[in-house]
Amino acid sequence: HEDKYHHFDLKINERGIDVKGLKKISRSDKAPTEHFHWVEIKNVSGKNGWAYSSCGYIIFETNDYWVIVETLELQDLVKNKVVKEYVDNTSEALYKLYQRKGRKDIITLVKTIDLMKIAYCVLDKSDVKS
């Protein structure tokens, strides 16, 4: 089940969960990285991004784990670590703001290790049955 308006991929016990897969830092990168994750502060419409959605949890994928973070904890991480400075390149976006030219979205790059520090729980993929 996916609800694009409320920004969640599935629900468990009435709490929305948004799952974020591995992503590249730059489009030119050969492969996605598990060491960093993009966090959407504002979406392409200029409204609150998925980090500020009504979801209860965001699940971040790594090669071997699912890192489950409460949305409010993620918001605190953004508030406490992100510098309100815009950068022009994705390679400079670690804890800074990046906005594509002509778009209203605002994203920042965070370290996966910092997500693990605030995680509600971390699940080993080998322990999770598909």
State where each predicted segment sits.
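Nucleic-acid endonuclease domains
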Residues: 1-130
